[in-house]
């Protein structure tokens, strides 16, 4: 009798988890008993939502060390271990937070519930897949992968097992970007400039996948329309990949975006301007400020006649801390993350199309 009750409870719990999983934007698995056993294994994660989440960090480069720092400070997180093929670097960061260091990510597959994957982009797919196969939820630094095929495989695998994929589009958590939601209404023209001085650490991919993809994600989030056509140009000046690029994106709803990114600039700049009916909005990401210029019928002097100018400033905040806390919340509550795998894939698709345009142009130009 006890065995029958236990079996019934097992299946009911599994069924309940399936219903919860269907609410995740990362996927909607079919509610069939063929899936029960693999989902039942994840029930424990839901039951442990009030306990500390066991987290790991793979990759201790420039960004990885900050991921470790943020997790170590969270009261509801247990930073279990840090992995990096560079043994001395892994040990250095691990010692700082009194956790174990590993030279292979495979050594922590069975020790954690969630992981930040902060390795070079070409390794994103393989490392992420290994963790997903062990029922570990993943936060993958942007770009999600190097190809759409890899992104699709990760998304499909996560969907089938009710797992969470969050992509690290950090600017989503910038206070200025969050504030934009209250002011941006159907923009018709957008222009962005993301310029950076040269840094060797980010040259394993093109500037399109390294920097421009931030603005691609932001613009796509506000335009909410499919890209109809792309015209792009770019060239590698210092590295073997494209170091400076410009793209004109035309959306189905009529909006046009002119996007520029460079990692060989003499200065750092991260700005975007959005033009819409009766107003335009200028955002300085680096200084966390927004300038809103709106049409006005008020009879008063202004720098621009007939226009009101309002400037908003925001505290710098900690976008990475907010991003990681959002990931932890999504994992513990089993809810959709702020930037799902599908969202990361959408930005990647546009970025790869831009890269293809650049390659085609350069192939015909440098003959």
Go through each PLM region and give its residues.
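Cysteine-centered motifs
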Residues: 5-7, 31
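Contiguous beta-strand/loop segments that form the cofactor/metal-binding neighborhood of enzyme cores
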Residues: 17, 216-289, 317, 321-334
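C-terminal helix-rich "cap/oligomerization" subdomain common to oxidoreductases
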Residues: 21-23, 28-49, 114-117, 326-367
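N-terminal Rossmann-like dinucleotide-binding module
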Residues: 31, 36-97, 219, 328, ...
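Beta-loop-alpha module in the N-terminal Rossmann-like domain of NAD(P)-dependent dehydrogenases
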Residues: 67, 97-155
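A contiguous active-site-proximal alpha/beta segment in oxidoreductase catalytic domains
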Residues: 145-202
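Mid-domain beta-loop-alpha active-site segment that forms a flexible
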Residues: 168-175, 198-227, 343-344
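C-terminal glycine/acidic-rich active-site capping loop/insertion
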Residues: 170, 276-342, 346, 363-367
């Amino acid at each position: 009798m006890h065995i029958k009750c236990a079996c019934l409870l097992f299946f009911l719990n599994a069924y309940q988890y399936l219903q919860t999983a269907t609410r995740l934007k990362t996927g909607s698995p079919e509610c069939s008993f063929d899936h029960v056993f693999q989902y039942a294994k994840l029930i424990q994660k839901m039951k442990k939502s009030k306990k500390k989440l066991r987290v790991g960090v793979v990759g201790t480069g420039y960004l990885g060390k900050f991921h470790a720092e943020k997790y170590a400070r969270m009261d509801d997180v247990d930073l279990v271990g840090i992995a990096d093929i560079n043994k001395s670097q892994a040990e250095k960061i691990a010692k700082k937070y009194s956790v174990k260091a590993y030279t292979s990510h495979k050594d922590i597959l069975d020790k954690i519930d969630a992981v930040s994957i902060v390795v070079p982009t070409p390794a994103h797919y393989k490392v992420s897949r290994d963790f997903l196969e062990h029922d570990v939820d993943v936060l993958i630094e942007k770009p999600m992968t190097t190809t759409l095929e890899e992104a699709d495989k990760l998304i499909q695998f996560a969907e089938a097992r009710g797992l969470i994929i969050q992509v690290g589009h950090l600017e989503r958590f910038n206070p200025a970007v969050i504030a934009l939601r209250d002011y941006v209404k159907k923009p018709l023209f957008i222009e962005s400039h993301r310029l950076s001085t040269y840094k060797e650490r980010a040259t394993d991919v093109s500037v399109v996948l390294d920097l421009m993809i931030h603005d691609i994600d932001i613009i796509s989030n506000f335009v909410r329309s499919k890209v109809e056509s792309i015209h792009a140009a770019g060239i590698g000046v210092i590295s073997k990949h494209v170091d400076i690029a410009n793209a004109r994106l035309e959306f189905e709803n009529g909006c046009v975006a002119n996007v520029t990114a460079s990692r060989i600039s003499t200065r750092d700049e991260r700005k975007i301007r959005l033009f819409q009916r009766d107003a335009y909005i200028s955002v300085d990401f680096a200084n966390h400020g927004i300038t809103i210029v709106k049409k006005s019928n008020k009879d008063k002097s202004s720098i621009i006649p007939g226009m009101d100018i309002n400037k908003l400033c925001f505290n710098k905040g900690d976008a990475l801390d907010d991003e990681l806390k959002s990931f932890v919340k999504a994992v513990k509550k089993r809810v959709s993350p702020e930037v799902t795998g599908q969202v990361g894939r959408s930005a990647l698709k546009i970025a790869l199309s831009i890269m293809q345009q650049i390659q085609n142009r350069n192939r015909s130009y440098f003959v």
